[in-house]
Curated annotation (Swiss-Prot):
It is found in: Cell inner membrane. The keyword Membrane applies. Transmembrane segments: none annotated. It is a peripheral membrane protein. Belongs to the ATPase delta chain family. InterPro entries: ATP_synth_OSCP/delta_N_sf (IPR026015), ATPase_OSCP/d_CS (IPR020781), ATPase_OSCP/dsu (IPR000711). GO terms for cellular component: plasma membrane; proton-transporting ATP synthase complex. PROSITE patterns: ATPASE_DELTA. It comes from Rhizobium etli (strain ATCC 51251 / DSM 11541 / JCM 21823 / NBRC 15573 / CFN 42). F(1)F(0) ATP synthase produces ATP from ADP in the presence of a proton or sodium gradient. F-type ATPases consist of two structural domains, F(1) containing the extramembraneous catalytic core and F(0) containing the membrane proton channel, linked together by a central stalk and a peripheral stalk. During catalysis, ATP synthesis in the catalytic domain of F(1) is coupled via a rotary mechanism of the central stalk subunits to proton translocation. GO terms for molecular function: proton-transporting ATP synthase activity, rotational mechanism. Keywords: ATP synthesis, Cell inner membrane, Cell membrane, CF(1), Hydrogen ion transport, Ion transport, Membrane, Transport. F-type ATPases have 2 components, F(1) - the catalytic core - and F(0) - the membrane proton channel. F(1) has five subunits: alpha(3), beta(3), gamma(1), delta(1), epsilon(1). F(0) has three main subunits: a(1), b(2) and c(10-14). The alpha and beta chains form an alternating ring which encloses part of the gamma chain. F(1) is attached to F(0) by a central stalk formed by the gamma and epsilon chains, while a peripheral stalk is formed by the delta and b chains. This is ATP synthase subunit delta.
Length: 188
């Protein structure tokens, strides 16, 4: 299967699972608690390369994935709908799509609140003040309230990459250095 087909499959799986989780959470009035648990789990993924590898790896059996997810959920204080959701995802061997499920859930929740969703990649964690300034700037551009999901990626070296819908603004130092490198190659 070509890479493009694999990513579309993952995206479709992620959206279906996220949609089901959102509908259940909405029905039970638990969207905020599920979102908080989602944020906690995403923070764990961002901080642990080992957890990222575990989630992405097809090597582990469904039983091993389930045991690990139960232990991780308990340690992180994740309970209720999201803990049960993680168990279903592990049993169905869909952990590889979990990062996409988290993104899709955030988009669905933001749309439900009348907001637009923005994905922000930063070299370092943003302070609450920086997040608020970014939200205000994006609201000024889009005219809507903005829900942001911040991912830390030290490889961008500095600056930000902001994705809103199909638009992307890349002010990362990595991109600027790459552009400079290409310009220097053309000159020399």
């Amino acid at each position: 299967m070509p890479v493009a087909d694999t990513s579309q499959l993952t995206s479709g799986v992620a959206e279906r699972y996220a949609s089901s989780l959102f509908e259940l959470a909405l029905e039970q009035g638990a969207v905020d608690s599920v979102t908080a648990d989602l944020d906690r789990f995403q923070a764990m993924l961002d901080e642990s390369a080992e957890l990222k590898r575990f989630v992405a790896s097809p090597v582990f059996s469904a039983e091993d994935q389930l045991k690990a997810i139960i232990a991780i959920s308990e340690r992180a204080g994740i309970s209720g709908f999201f803990a049960n959701f993680l168990k279903v995802v592990a049993r169905n061997r869909r952990l590889f799509a979990l990062p996409g499920m988290i993104k899709a859930f955030r988009v669905i929740a933001a749309n439900h609140r009348g907001e637009i969703s923005a994905e922000v990649t930063s070299a370092h964690a943003l302070t609450a003040e920086q997040e608020n300034e970014l939200k205000a700037a994006l609201k000024g551009v889009t005219g809507k309230d903005v829900a942001i999901a911040v991912t830390v990626d030290p490889s961008i070296l500095g600056g930000l990459i902001v994705k809103v819908g199909s638009r992307q603004i890349d002010t990362s130092l990595r991109t600027k250095l790459s552009t400079l490198k290409l310009a220097l190659k053309e000159v020399g």
